């Protein structure tokens, strides 16, 4: 039964903000249990809302989910609680901001053993910008290693709440969950009653169903949506019929009407999930709203990588798999490309490194496609001498040096939260990665928040792994894109016997090009198998070779059959062998094994 007019004041829309592993999905399970949306014996798996295998395995939430719960408070009133689950990872911050826009309140969940982490702060700022009521919650208070008082001080310093406003819970054991439910009802504001206004509904997520097409999850901000209405999407001006609308409580419940304040879903035979864009506004054709809801933007991919099938005859399988994946993931962008070394494949754009890993893992796991990935890189802006601007996301597309005026690369602002004893290590890593140090804030006596600005190209690679290893796993990071800046960048080519291998070329800063070239040549020397002739591995910038390694030839002893005898006989055989090797070198192609392309990814090891 959808809420009627009198019940708009009984609706509470809220989300949970937390760093990875701070217990967000477990807390959501407890809320479902307390409200009897699900009984504990029905929970075949923990983390009910994380329904992808990958989400459960990595312990992260990738897609936003929504679930409606009914709760009878201690004041005897029946409330409708809409929990909108948000992805917690930096790559998905736009999805987070749209999920937050669908809420009036947020639970800020902090692990009692870990304290405030970087992504908690980043998402908290998004929530404050969205004007949400924030309820701080300390989770995992039952663990022996928990420091509840210390974490409470961090939260007070961060958002300036009173100590008694901070709730203490253990999501796993259900301690304090009843108090939390009462706090949600008491502190989260009810939605505004805008039913008289023209319809405006915010899409905060969309999923693809093989039978129904794209299903949009929506929050009705203004007006009323009825089943059978003709609706228009602002982003692409397309018109659809609302075939089915309803609310979500782990499964879809069809209703006839959704009013301002409600959260639900909309099915209208949309063939492509790209037509139901996250952040878009839906209005009625008959009585349209004058303008869309604020905050919509087209999400641009930040990291690019080539995906190639291991077996060249699997190209069509890869195409089909990418098509199916992109139905569910509107932020995945891909175009076909060819490489002389790897054959046919796709150039894919991702929101960030985690997004890239997830796509690769899902391709291999859900679709059984074995793929090779090239070095991830970012999109550079090349200002030509003619004055035009070219965007380059693949080193092999870089124009000739003589035609380039200058090159710009994307920068990000990053905050790193860590224990104070690791500051030195992190500063060193920051300087190695061309970071600009900004400032340091102390969160408490032992934890600091360090601000840097980095070129995105230095961060997309293995920065997160390095950060974790130098801080023994204690550092967490979060970054946001701040724009393009001019840099002294060069294209580094790898030549095998004078032939460039396009899949191994990369764009690096001039100051690092010699070291990178040398390391790459040494790495390849250990991977490329020996041939019957000498192989020269060279790293070059333009026509200038800056590093070289040689793989010596395998040699057959042609003198074995000459026991004694004349030196000229031996010389003749050696000359003949030399001649043959020279001819082989001219016609032979060096086979580059697949490990060589992966070597670039772990060049420092």
From Swiss-Prot:
PROSITE patterns: G_TR_2
KW Protein biosynthesis (keyword) present: yes
Molecular function terms from GO: GTP binding; GTPase activity; ribosome binding; translation elongation factor activity
Compartment annotation: Cell inner membrane
Entry's EC annotation: 3.6.5.n1
Reaction(s) catalysed (UniProt annotation): GTP + H2O = GDP + phosphate + H(+)
Keywords: Cell inner membrane, Cell membrane, GTP-binding, Hydrolase, Membrane, Nucleotide-binding, Protein biosynthesis
Annotated Gene Ontology cellular component terms: plasma membrane
Superkingdom classification of source: Bacteria
Main location: membrane
Any GO BP annotation: positive regulation of translation
Domain (tr-type G) ranges: 9-192
Membrane-protein topology: Peripheral membrane protein
Known role: Required for accurate and efficient protein synthesis under certain stress conditions. May act as a fidelity factor of the translation reaction, by catalyzing a one-codon backward translocation of tRNAs on improperly translocated ribosomes. Back-translocation proceeds from a post-translocation (POST) complex to a pre-translocation (PRE) complex, thus giving elongation factor G a second chance to translocate the tRNAs correctly. Binds to ribosomes in a GTP-dependent manner.
Family, similarity comment: Belongs to the TRAFAC class translation factor GTPase superfamily. Classic translation factor GTPase family. LepA subfamily.
Name of the protein in its database record: Elongation factor 4
Organism annotation: Chlorobaculum tepidum (strain ATCC 49652 / DSM 12025 / NBRC 103806 / TLS)
